[in-house]
Amino acid sequence: MSSLYPSLEDLKVDQAIQAQVRASPKMPALPVQATAISPPPVLYPNLAELENYMGLSLSSQEVQESLLQIPEGDSTAVSGPGPGQMVAPVTGYSLGVRRAEIKPGVREIHLCKDERGKTGLRLRKVDQGLFVQLVQANTPASLVGLRFGDQLLQIDGRDCAGWSSHKAHQVVKKASGDKIVVVVRDRPFQRTVTMHKDSMGHVGFVIKKGKIVSLVKGSSAARNGLLTNHYVCEVDGQNVIGLKDKKIMEILATAGNVVTLTIIPSVIYEHMVKKLPPVLLHHTMDHSIPDA
């Protein structure tokens, strides 16, 4: 099975590293001698030769810390990642990647109501499915980790397929305030794109009212398949829907060298937020940074 990578930069750097590993002459085994203890060797040799590869500064502390090391005294070969595991020599252990992850499969959550009898959730019907349109900040819906674009499959054991938004809200309204069992699929219309900032701190795209309108040729955004006519839903897992472009760019600027965007096709986004007052998106939507 082919290896998986969070970004094109990770794939290319790993290929270059593996080529160096294969080209390195194998040293013959030597008798064990009492020598001074040396620091554990890095698995990937000659990293300095890859400095500034694809516009990346590979000698940075972040990258050095993410590289796999051979345990001291271990003379056995180091095996590669297992099937389905990510290989990330550049991205490393990125919190943004983890926060933005769209998990496959379905999960069950237990929702409740606040002292006003509210869940903080607004739902919308799309293609016979029921989706999260709005999660209000500091509400039961935000506390259980529901996000914009999540699909609700069941509410208290009842299938939601074909329900109108009105029916769904009525079912939630009549449900118990202590426990509402909801089966959810993570954001099926959305996908994530992981990119790396260049020496100027840019990843290479332009937004207008939250929508990606152009890409910079040769940038990390272009290399990694970021698409125009898509809206930015999250930056490193933090919801940015409804925020001004200036605020979104500020969040991007303060992010690390690795940035993961969650995007959604404009036709789906515009249908989902239709008839939703912009003030709710800007001031009411949960824009907090989620737990990893």
Swiss-Prot record:
Tissues expressing this chain: Preferentially expressed in cells of the digestive tract. Low expression in skeletal muscle and kidney. Detected in differentiated keratinocytes of normal and malignant epithelium. In healthy skin, expression is localized in suprabasal epidermal layers.
Keyword Repeat: yes
Transmembrane feature ranges: none
Compartment(s): Cytoplasm; Nucleus, Nucleolus; Nucleus, Nucleoplasm; Cell membrane
Induction: Down-regulated by HPV8 E6 papillomavirus (HPV) oncoprotein (at protein level).
PROSITE patterns, per database record: PDZ
Swiss-Prot/TrEMBL GO biological process terms: cell population proliferation; intracellular signal transduction; intracellular transport; nervous system development
Molecular-function GO terms, alphabetical: identical protein binding; phosphatidylinositol-4,5-bisphosphate binding; protein heterodimerization activity; protein homodimerization activity
Ranges of residues in domain PDZ: 108-187, 192-267
GO cellular component, one term: Golgi apparatus
Protein's UniProt keywords contain Transferase: no
Main location: cytoplasm
Pfam family for this entry, one: PDZ
InterPro entries the record matches: APP-Binding (IPR051230), PDZ (IPR001478), PDZ_sf (IPR036034)
Subunit structure: Monomer and homodimer. Interacts with SDCBP. Interacts with TM4SF1.
PANTHER family: SYNTENIN RELATED (PTHR12345), SYNTENIN-2 (PTHR12345:SF13)
Function: Binds phosphatidylinositol 4,5-bisphosphate (PIP2). May play a role in the organization of nuclear PIP2, cell division and cell survival.
Entry comment, domain topic: Binds phosphatidylinositol 4,5-bisphosphate (PIP2) via its two PDZ domains. These domains target SDCBP2 to the plasma membranes and nucleoli, two PIP2-rich regions.
Name of the featured protein: Syntenin-2
Gene (UniProt): SDCBP2
